Regions:
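Intrinsically disordered, low-complexity acidic Ser/Thr-rich regulatory segments
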Residues: 1-35, 45-47, 75, 82, ...
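Beta-rich catalytic cores
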Residues: 38
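Forkhead-associated
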Residues: 28, 41-82
C-alpha cells in the first residue's frame, strides 16, 4: 500500500504495474491538489515478491529514502520506504 503523508490517504498497490501521477485517465493512483506532480510521474512494478519504483522522466523527480531515482531505472523498494514524488511524500508498505 501507499500512504499519502499529507492526508493519510491509503491506496492499495495492485497488479504488476501501478502508475502514479495527476492524470486520472492514465494512472492507477491520481494525486490531486499538487501541480508539481507530473501527469504520469512514476511506476511501481512487482517482480516476484519484490517491488520497484521507476521515475517516468518526471519534471520534479522521484526519491526513495532521500535518494534520487534516475529516470527509467527501477529502484528497489523496501517495506516502509519513504517515497517522495516532487514534494509529496508517501510511505510504501509491502502487502
Amino acid at each position: 500500500t501507499l500512504q499519502r503523508c499529507r492526508d493519510n490517504e491509503i491506496k492499495a498497490v495492485e497488479g504488476n504495474e501501478f502508475l502514479i501521477g495527476k492524470d486520472a485517465a492514465k494512472v492507477d493512483y491520481a494525486i490531486f491538489n499538487n501541480e508539481t506532480i507530473s501527469r504520469v510521474h512514476a511506476k511501481i512494478t512487482k517482480q516476484g515478491n519484490e517491488y520497484y519504483i521507476t521515475d517516468a522522466n518526471s519534471m520534479n523527480h522521484t526519491y526513495v529514502d532521500g535518494v534520487i531515482v534516475p529516470p527509467g531505472a527501477p529502484f528497489k523498494l523496501s517495506n516502509m520506504s519513504k517515497i517522495r514524488l516532487s514534494d509529496e511524500e508517501f510511505i510504501f508498505q509491502k502487502p
